[in-house]
Amino acid sequence: MMPEDYDFINACYGRPVTRTPVWLMRQAGRYLPQYRKIRERVKFLELCKTPELAAEVTLQPVDALGVDAAILFSDILIPIEAMGQNLFYRPAPVLEPPVRTAADVEALRVLQPEQDVPFVLETIRLLRRELDGRVPLIGFGGAPFTLACYMVEGAGSRHFLALKRLMYQAPETYARLMDKITDTSIVYLRAQAEAGAQALQVFDSWGGILSPADYQRYVLPYSRRLLSALGDFGIPLIHFVKGAGAMLDLVAMAGGQVVGLDWCTSLNRARDILGNGMAVQGNLDPSVLLGAQDIIEREVRRILDENAGRPGHIFNLGHGILPEVPPENAAFLVDCVHRLTQS
């Protein structure tokens, strides 16, 4: 299929669609029994690094739910391992040793995709063959700030105080770290596009922990450089910053065609702020999928009503789908969006 034949691609550019496209963040995951069956015999990192299995898992929600896009099964921390930190899952991710000093930063190296992550590129090539034009394939990576949060903290955190301490006490070291991560993110995502990804999403899961002023100073320059470096491929770029409702104008300044919204942001307000030149993606609260199907349909209708038929809307969750969600509710959501918006 040509790019103009995909509702997902058309929505990213604000072009007419036959119906509102929908896909779900973390749509390949633990809520699907077929995914859990694979995970019974394979550890998470091994799954990410085995192209045949990663491709199989990527395709599961396409077949089971009828989503309008596939997203590469991987993890945002994969490129960090190649930079020189050890990556473990216990079961949450742990990075050792944490990056805390100027010497730690200098010891990091910029990723070389074909050498360091050939499995990611082979998974993309395999998926393009297996999808055979059914739906477009989204590649993805972490935003520089979110990757820095994990690298400095060494694990997930509620407040990321080690990262903020570095940011405020050693701004030159912080800037050098962010430059190295941005350089890695650029070559990593460019390699995904060259391998065949038809859209790219940049996940900034922790960008919302900062004030708008700090986001503008410490995050925006690097996210803008990353997105700018991906613009020559002619594919849609989606920028998702969780918790960014108070600074959507700054998020839009980073570039790309689509701003992802979490569920704490009014879609109607977001569209007013962003204007007609920027598409939006979102933004159902993932926990709604734990409810009855009449509740799911009510919330789908509310979000569609907030969008008011404006072009450039991709329906999605406001964050990743929860492992506890019944698969039939996820399938109902996709069907509901399609049914209510079919032209």
From Swiss-Prot:
Nucleotidyltransferase as UniProt keyword: no
Positions bearing the site annotation: Transition state stabilizer: D75
CDD domains, A to Z: URO-D
Localization, UniProt: Cytoplasm
InterPro entries documented for this protein: UROD/MetE-like_sf (IPR038071), Uroporphyrinogen_deCO2ase_HemE (IPR006361), Uroporphyrinogen_deCOase (IPR000257)
Reaction(s) this enzyme catalyzes, per UniProt: uroporphyrinogen III + 4 H(+) = coproporphyrinogen III + 4 CO2
Family: Belongs to the uroporphyrinogen decarboxylase family.
PANTHER family: METHYLTETRAHYDROFOLATE:HOMOCYSTEINE METHYLTRANSFERASE RELATED (PTHR21091), UROPORPHYRINOGEN DECARBOXYLASE (PTHR21091:SF169)
EC top class, as a word: lyase
Involved pathway(s): Porphyrin-containing compound metabolism; protoporphyrin-IX biosynthesis; coproporphyrinogen-III from 5-aminolevulinate: step 4/4
Role: Catalyzes the decarboxylation of four acetate groups of uroporphyrinogen-III to yield coproporphyrinogen-III.
Protein name in UniProt: Uroporphyrinogen decarboxylase
EC code: 4.1.1.37
Subunit structure: Homodimer.
Molecular function GO terms recorded: uroporphyrinogen decarboxylase activity
GO cellular component: cytosol
Residues the record lists as binding substrate: R26, Q27, A28, G29, R30, D75, Y150, S205, H319
One of the GO biological process terms: protoporphyrinogen IX biosynthetic process from glutamate
Native source species: Syntrophotalea carbinolica (strain DSM 2380 / NBRC 103641 / GraBd1)
Keywords: Cytoplasm, Decarboxylase, Lyase, Porphyrin biosynthesis
